[in-house]
């Protein structure tokens, strides 16, 4: 794509632009969702996605691809806030964990089938079709949703929204700064990467705490859990292929195994279970990060199998904790649309931030002469620290049951 459009200077920008624009959109999506009826939101998000897809598909230059990616990111942020808010409004606290468990299963198929299918389409008819064809499925799916969207309870609200544009914009700016820094091999690039990671992480935490000031721990634990899990999966294929000399097929199998474990375990959430699944899940992700470290140290076939097993353990942990930690914030008295936007912001921002941490730090270290295995080991160690942090935050959270017992 970059070669055909003579746009290698902008090659890295579209990779980060979608996440950054989605984070920025989510920082002020709540007031929009509070004032605009659901059907109009659905239509607007769909139109934005189609416009972005058309711009990228018909791009005569790399700047058009960047613009289309930004617009699709805005559409994704708007719809993510709407969708999670709708779950909070339609289902009670007993049903929500089950719904969020199904939510993970729904995107499993696109996550597994999408990349190889797009690779085949690109090889067969070119990258423009690979970018454009999903828009057809999006329009069909949104049309089906539109037939039942009137079931979502909605009343216009004029009160204060959960995420503030100033802080949310700061998150987007920090991610953009860090993305630029990760692509710059100079000392200033490294400074920008570290600065973007530090300020971005602090701004994300500030957004979530301000959004639900009375009980932010479930939301914070959810964000840190997403960062630890998706950070590990960000480098899983790289660890197997570059670090251990395995094949693309093995790497794809490891990713698929982890995502499948997440989806299957998530189908049977255990609210109130012992041990607490919302604490056990991050604990399993921590164990998985240690297994990834061990796999890099073992090398050979033993290392490959250790990393594959670690991916599955991480998936089991995510399946245990994700449905609970993503549904518990709705126990707050805030409007469902506000809470849904905060949950979407937490996952999207944390995933973008950890992609910068994992991918950006690995690139920076590798570019400065580090061996791939040593660079991967350092990143996996940092991800283990994140998983341990998620365990600590989740263990100290105030669940609805604990709140009831205290009364």
Q: In which residue ranges do the predicted regions lie?
A:
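Helix-terminus/helix-capping segments at the ends of transmembrane helices and short amphipathic helices
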Residues: 2, 84-92, 101, 106, ...
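Interfacial loop-to-helix junctions that mark the boundaries of transmembrane helices
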Residues: 9-11, 65-68, 125-126, 158-160, ...
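12-transmembrane solute porter fold
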Residues: 9-34, 39, 47, 52, ...
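Helix-loop-helix hairpins in multi-pass membrane proteins, especially solute transporters
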Residues: 23, 29-30, 34-158, 359
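Alpha-helical transmembrane segments
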Residues: 45-49, 109-111, 164-175, 285-288
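Membrane-interface helix caps and helix-loop-helix hairpins in membrane proteins
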Residues: 62, 180-185, 271, 300-301
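Hydrophobic transmembrane-helix bundles of small-molecule transporters
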Residues: 119, 123-236
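Short, Lys/Arg-enriched, Gly/Pro-containing loop segments at transmembrane-helix junctions
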Residues: 153-158, 331, 399-407
């Amino acid at each position: 794509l970059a070669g055909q459009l003579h746009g290698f200077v902008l090659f890295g920008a579209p990779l980060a632009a979608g996440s950054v624009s989605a984070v920025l959109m989510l920082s002020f999506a709540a007031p929009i969702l509070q004032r605009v009826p659901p059907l109009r939101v659905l239509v607007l998000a769909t139109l934005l996605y189609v416009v972005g897809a058309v711009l990228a598909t018909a791009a005569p230059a790399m700047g058009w691809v960047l613009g289309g990616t930004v617009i699709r990111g805005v559409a994704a942020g708007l719809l993510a806030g709407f969708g999670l808010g709708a779950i909070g409004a339609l289902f009670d606290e007993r049903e929500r964990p089950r719904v969020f468990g199904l939510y993970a299963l729904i995107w499993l198929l696109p996550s597994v089938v999408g990349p190889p299918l797009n690779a085949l389409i690109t090889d067969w008819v070119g990258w423009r079709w690979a970018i454009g064809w999903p828009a057809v499925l999006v329009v069909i799916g949104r049309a089906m949703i539109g037939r039942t969207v009137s079931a979502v309870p909605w009343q216009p609200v004029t009160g204060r929204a959960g995420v503030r544009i100033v802080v949310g914009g700061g998150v987007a700016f920090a991610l953009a700064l860090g993305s630029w820094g990760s692509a710059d091999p100079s000392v200033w690039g490294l400074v920008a990467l570290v600065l973007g990671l530090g300020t971005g992480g602090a701004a994300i935490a500030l957004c979530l705490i301000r959004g639900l000031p009375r009980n932010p721990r479930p939301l914070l634990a959810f964000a840190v859990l997403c960062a630890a899990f998706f950070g590990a999966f960000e480098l899983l294929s790289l660890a197997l292929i570059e670090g251990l000399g395995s094949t693309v097929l093995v790497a794809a199998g490891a990713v698929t195994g982890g995502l499948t474990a997440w989806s299957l375990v998530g189908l049977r959430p255990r609210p109130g279970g012992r041990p607490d699944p919302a604490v056990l899940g991050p604990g399993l992700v921590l164990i998985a990060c240690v297994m990834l470290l061990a796999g890099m140290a073992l090398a050979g076939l033993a290392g490959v199998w250790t990393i594959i097993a670690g991916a599955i353990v991480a998936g089991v942990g995510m399946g245990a904790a994700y449905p609970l930690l993503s549904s518990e914030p709705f126990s707050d008295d805030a409007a469902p649309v506000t809470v849904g936007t905060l949950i979407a912001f937490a996952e999207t921002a944390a995933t973008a931030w950890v992609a910068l941490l994992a991918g950006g730090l690995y690139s920076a270290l590798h570019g400065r002469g580090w061996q791939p295995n040593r660079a991967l080991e350092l990143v996996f160690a940092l991800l283990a620290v994140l998983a341990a942090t998620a365990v600590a935050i989740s263990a100290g959270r105030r669940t609805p049951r604990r709140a009831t017992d205290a009364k």
